[in-house]
């Protein structure tokens, strides 16, 4: 039986109610999920609590897993799998972290619009975030559709952006927040990478903007000018008409396509426990289309 999903937003995001994630998926079910992702870019699975083994097994259906920022963090993990990212305000001893702890700073960085692991090549493909413990209020996650944002740009602006590239760096979003105390080893763990501002999605064939909080500047332009252009594009892309806000329930799993979706966490009381757990798959290396007109991933 094919999976089906109902739109939660006029442009993207589907809720899937007829697929159990705790067991093995058939090849047909994996293809169905990928087809739904190509169209909707975000899928919501309600009432699907997963342990660490189940989450890893589900994620591995969709490609090689990546560790992302763990190369920079260089800290012990609470999890049995290095590929699971701890999206929480909980320290390794299991207690809620102090307000100035790096775990909490990481939560603030996650409240900036970003694409997971855009600071590496290949970058992330899918992220799968599971809700374990939630605060009494706040802590929603927002997603914006970068395909629709690109489509909505004036044609002359699209032409101006064609061929421009931005440099993405793992620590840029942390530096924005004043979190600069990193060793040379940490700073050099993931060198900056260059990405085209406009790319083409390999699954849907749609063009999209590729920006976010890891993008530090536009190559070949003065830093100030490039950053203002990035800010203008982000302001355009995150208009309410392009944004879906997810209010979490324990047991939710949300899956999104980092190639064509930005996301951010929303504010909550950081003294209240909030635990989510993320697995992320790697994408393919970005390549130039056969006609040389766009970058495809």
Swiss-Prot record:
Pathway: Xenobiotic degradation; (2,4-dichlorophenoxy)acetate degradation. GO terms for biological process: 2,4-dichlorophenoxyacetic acid catabolic process. Its cofactor is Fe(2+). It is an enzyme of class 1 (oxidoreductase). Activated by ascorbate. The keyword Metal-binding applies. Binds 1 Fe(2+) ion per subunit. InterPro entries: TauD-like_sf, TauD/TfdA-like, TfdA_dioxygenase. Its EC number is 1.14.11.-. Pfam families: TauD. 2-oxoglutarate binds at residues 141, 248, 274, 278. Fe cation binds at residues 114, 116, 263. It catalyses: (2,4-dichlorophenoxy)acetate + 2-oxoglutarate + O2 = 2,4-dichlorophenol + glyoxylate + succinate + CO2. One of its GO terms (molecular function) is metal ion binding. Keywords: Aromatic hydrocarbons catabolism, Dioxygenase, Iron, Metal-binding, Oxidoreductase, Vitamin C. Involved in degradation of the herbicide 2,4-dichlorophenoxyacetic acid (2,4-D). Is also able to degrade 2-methyl-4-chlorophenoxyacetic acid and 3-chlorobenzoic acid. Belongs to the TfdA dioxygenase family. This is Alpha-ketoglutarate-dependent 2,4-dichlorophenoxyacetate dioxygenase. It comes from Burkholderia sp. (strain RASC). The lineage of its organism: Bacteria, Pseudomonadati, Pseudomonadota, Betaproteobacteria, Burkholderiales.
